[in-house]
Amino acid sequence: MPAPSAGTAGAVTTFSFGDPTPVLDSRGLFDYLECWRNGRHYEPPITLSGLSRTTRSNPFLHSGLTFKRNMLVRTFVPHRLLDRTAFSQLALDYLVFGMAYLGRQISHSGRLLQLHPLMAQYMRRGVQPGEFFQVRAGRAEHEFAPGSVHQLREADTDQEIYGLPEWLAVVQSALLNESATLFRRRYYTNGSHAGFILYMTDPQPEGMDVDALREALRDSRGPGNFRNLFVHSPNGKKDGLQLIPISEVAAKDEFTGIKRVTRDDILAALRIPPQLLGIVPQNAGGFGSIRDAATVWASMELAPLQSRMAMVNEWLGEEVITFAPFDLVPVAP
């Protein structure tokens, strides 16, 4: 709509928000999930640095991924070729990016000395089979020897080159949760607690009085807010000065609701019971037995994760990645 002309006396300006946009009718982020061929290697279908930053935007997402990593490391049986530290990096990359890379360190005699994880954020798959590159900003590409790198990836329905994380569907929920928190921080930092419309129809105040009132309202924001305002209007009308609050109570309710709904979305995507992440129940009955929840989660979620991580053994030709049975007894260091 055309912009309203400025300075029109007595004019009421209105505007409308855009119509809701259906996901299936728009070209959004996931419409571009294809791998662009960049000469010698393929580019990932989504920015990997963005995925890494997204995990730190929400406490439930970051805590849930860390919890899964910790449970995998807890049950992992160290091997002479792969220690717990290296496996921890491998598991974290797989959970965050939906893919992980493991490289072989070969001696001059051809003997396998060690397996070391390669950071998935900087790895690129080559155009030719078995080719992998490490790409970092400001540095030359490093090409690995053919067959020396193994890629463990989540299956995807759009392409077969890179993996995508299971939690990709809740990126919007995680960012909405962050936006709500940032809005609340700005709300308190800026002192925007004078959230109201001051509707004045009283003809009694003079121009100077209106300017003084406007200045007093402007000074009520920022540090030292919650000031009381005094208005004296002799012979004024009963409804000549009306205060219509619009933000404080509504903003609190929306903030709480957004935090709760987005948290539930993230927990559903990660498939972790809330009591395992230390979430305080809001109902009197609670979440039930945490021991039962941990046992069921280990059977339904941890065991399939362990099976996918153990697929590396098929590439190695020996049992390097193995896991101990899950139990609730502390594991000796």
Model-based region annotation:
Residues 108-163:
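Active-site and NAD+-binding cores of ADP-ribose-processing enzymes
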Residues 1-8, 12, 71, 140-273, ...:
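Extended, charged amphipathic alpha-helical segments
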Residues 39-50, 78-81, 133-146, 171-174, ...:
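Short N-terminal helix-initiation segments at or just after the protein's N-terminus
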Residues 76-77, 91-95, 99, 105, ...:
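Noncatalytic linker/hinge segments flanking ATPase motor cores
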Residues 1-123, 161-164, 249, 286, ...:
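Flexible, gly/proline-biased loop segments at the beginnings
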Residues 96-98, 108-111, 129, 192-193, ...:
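Short, well-ordered loop/turn elements at secondary-structure boundaries
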